[in-house]
Amino acid sequence: SLLSDSVSFDLVILRLGGLIDQDRHPIYHLQGRKDLSDPNGVVNLVHRIDVIHAIKCLIDSNIHNGLYNLVSPDHPKREEYYTKMAGFLKLELPEFKKEKGNYKEVKGDKITQLQGFKYQGDIWLSLR
């Protein structure tokens, strides 16, 4: 907010969730780890294809100013998601602490108001 309020030129800010695709995924860093916190928190991820598509839509729509969160509308719980992804990719399962914790679900729907933009990336990488 400070940056966007203090500049006198056009500025579009894209705030990305955790970036994923077939070759880039946070489970590779979490595999086999123990005592991970916040099992009931939600994941806020975005697929690479959605980032590319959002940039193209912003350019095509001639947007010069704005702040956009790019986050998949799918927000599974951390323990469920990372455990399933580790199993799917045949990696050692992560272990989560049994705690309630807090979570923050980031909304990425503002970008969907642009002509032609719809989230298409699959954060489950076709697991489901």
Language-model segments: residues:
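Short-chain dehydrogenase/reductase
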Residues: 1, 41-45, 75
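Conserved beta-loop-beta element that borders a ligand/cofactor-binding pocket
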Residues: 1-22
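Substrate-positioning beta->alpha
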Residues: 12-16, 25-27, 35-57
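Short beta-loop-alpha junction of Rossmann-like oxidoreductase domains
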Residues: 22-28, 79
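Short glycine/proline- and charge-enriched loop/turn segments
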Residues: 29-37, 88-92
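Amphipathic alpha-helical segment in the mid-to-C-terminal domain
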Residues: 48, 78, 116-120
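Mid/C-terminal beta-alpha module of Rossmann-like enzyme folds, strongest
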Residues: 52-108
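Amphipathic terminal alpha-helices
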Residues: 123-128
